[in-house]
Every structure is written in structure tokens, then in C-alpha cells.
């Protein structure tokens, strides 16, 4: 209840300047989710991500509340996407390349969502520059990306392993347009960060390395 009150306070402060979405990460039981989704809808939250783990519970919840329900952890590839779509268990799919089983399977997940009238969101697992570039290329091919994307993984890193950083500006990521993925690795930086047995990380008392 405290968490939902906190979300409600944030939304009240933001007003119409920004939308609010909540990721529950499967932390609720179905009963808790029923109460929580109703309260979040009343607070003005526009989307709740994976409130429960079970697809059957998602199916029941999505029919009860006006707030959009997004499937995330339940999506592990085309087969799970088809099952969720078959039972109408979500309003939105969070498509993640690794979780889907690779870029081609992510495209299949998106195609299933489109066919079922389910919205798409381009998810992230906090990939570095290479994984983010692959995600950007894949998501740019989606016919619809109604719920946007947030490929911010590289922005959390303090070191680069490519010769040129990805182009972030004005809250947008430009899809790399060079050969292949559009990313060129800095071989010296890759060698520096390699953990191949030659250079080892040793933890010493006091936290010194």
C-alpha cells in the first residue's frame, strides 16, 4: 500500500506532463494484483508490467481493469508469446532479444503480438553497446511499437569497448548505419577488459583489488 501511495503521489505531482508505468516483477499474488491494479488505475497509472507470474492469472486480471497489462518475464520466445496471445493474457508484450531467444525469435514474438492486436514495447536487459545496437536494429523493423522503448544500457557504463559511442541525443537513440551492426569494436579495449585467465581479479581484505 505504501508503494502504491508513493506512485499515486508521483503521478499527482506530474499531472499530464508525463505518464507513469509500474513494473511489479511478478511480486504480487493474484489477490494482491487485483487490489493493486485497481488502486494504480485510480491513481492514473497507464500500465502495469507483469504483476504476477502465472499466465492464467494474467488472463483473468487483464479482463478486469482499464490499466494496460504488460507481459515480460512470461515471454520466453514465440511459443510463450503464442500461448499468452491465445488466451488474451496481456495488452502489451515487452520484447527482449535475449529473453526471446535471439533477434529472429524476437521478430516472431512481435509478429504474434501484431496478429493478436497486442501492443509492443521494446525492452532492455541493460545490454552494452553491441546488444543495444542489435535491439535497435530489430525494433526499428517492427511495424508497430506503440509503447516505445528505452535502450539505455550503454548510458550506465563508464567505459566503452567500441571505437565510437552510440548516438544518444534528445532522448533518442539513432540506429547505427555502418556495416553489419554499425558498431566497430576497439580491439585494444576489448583486450584490456578480457578475462581469459591471464589477468585475474583478486579480492583482498578491506575490499582492495
Language model features by range: what are they?
Residues 26-28, 48, 66, 70-76, ...:
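Short, exposed beta-strand "edge-strand" segments with a Pro/Gly-rich flavor and a Y/T-containing core
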Residues 33, 81, 189-190:
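Hydrophobic/aromatic residues in well-formed alpha-helices
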Residues 1-65:
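Metal-dependent enolase-superfamily TIM-barrel catalytic cores that perform enediolate-based chemistry
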Amino acid at each position: 500500500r505504501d508503494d502504491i501511495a508513493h506512485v499515486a503521489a508521483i503521478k499527482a505531482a506530474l499531472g499530464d506532463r508525463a505518464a507513469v508505468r509500474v513494473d511489479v516483477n511478478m511480486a504480487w499474488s493474484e489477490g494482491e494484483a487485483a487490489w493493486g491494479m485497481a488502486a494504480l488505475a485510480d491513481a492514473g497509472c497507464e500500465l502495469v508490467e507483469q504483476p504476477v507470474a502465472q499466465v492464467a492469472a494474467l488472463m483473468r486480471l487483464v479482463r478486469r481493469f482499464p490499466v494496460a497489462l504488460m507481459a515480460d518475464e512470461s515471454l520466453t520466445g514465440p511459443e510463450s508469446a503464442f500461448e499468452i496471445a491465445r488466451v488474451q493474457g496481456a495488452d502489451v508484450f515487452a520484447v527482449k532479444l535475449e529473453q526471446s531467444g535471439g533477434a529472429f525469435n524476437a521478430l516472431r514474438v512481435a509478429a504474434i503480438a501484431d496478429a493478436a492486436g497486442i501492443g509492443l514495447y521494446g525492452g532492455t536487459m541493460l545490454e552494452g553497446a553491441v546488444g543495444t545496437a542489435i535491439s535497435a536494429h530489430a525494433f526499428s523493423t517492427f511495424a508497430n511499437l506503440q509503447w516505445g522503448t528505452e535502450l539505455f544500457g550503454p548510458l550506465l557504463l563508464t567505459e566503452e569497448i567500441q571505437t565510437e559511442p552510440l548516438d544518444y541525443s534528445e532522448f533518442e537513440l539513432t540506429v547505427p548505419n555502418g556495416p553489419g551492426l554499425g558498431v566497430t569494436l576497439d580491439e585494444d579495449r576489448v583486450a584490456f577488459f578480457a578475462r581469459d585467465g591471464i589477468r585475474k581479479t583478486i579480492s583482498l581484505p578491506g575490499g582492495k583489488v
